[in-house]
Amino acid sequence: MTRIRRGYIARRRRTKIRLFASSFRGAHSRLTRTITQQKIRALVSAHRDRDRQKINFRRLWITRINAAIRERGVCYSYSRFINDLYKRQLLLNRKILAQIAISNRNCLYMISNEIIKEVSWKESTG
């Protein structure tokens, strides 16, 4: 049987994979099979962590808002604050509220005080 000389296609494919893994350490950037495995693993981790990042940021925003709210009012919590925001139909998302809590805490206190006053006034009047 005659020998078949491989063309440039396989070499081009391997070069493309090697460029992806050029920043990896050791055999993960040198051996083709290992590079392929590490590329799959890296892409899986990236996909998983994109979702995890959204969850972590939401958790961070909620923690910051809750800390700022509890600092001012003793018996007032994050869940009551968000519930009162929805009742008042104020469309402020958690990201914006967390930024306000860090940069301009007095503004957040003003918002929460207005909401507390209005909700308590509505509850007292019926």
Curated annotation (Swiss-Prot):
GO cellular component, one term: ribosome
Native source species: Helianthus annuus (Common sunflower)
Keywords: Chloroplast, Plastid, Ribonucleoprotein, Ribosomal protein, RNA-binding, rRNA-binding
GO terms of biological process kind: ribosomal large subunit assembly; translation
CDD domains named in the record: Ribosomal_L20 (cd07026)
Physiological role: Binds directly to 23S ribosomal RNA and is necessary for the in vitro assembly process of the 50S ribosomal subunit. It is not involved in the protein synthesizing functions of that subunit.
Entry annotated with the keyword Amino-acid biosynthesis: no
Gene Ontology molecular function: rRNA binding; structural constituent of ribosome
Record keyword RNA-binding present: yes
Subcellular location: Plastid, Chloroplast
Family under the similarity heading: Belongs to the bacterial ribosomal protein bL20 family.
Primary location group: plastid
Record-given protein name: Large ribosomal subunit protein bL20c
Superkingdom, natural source: Eukaryota
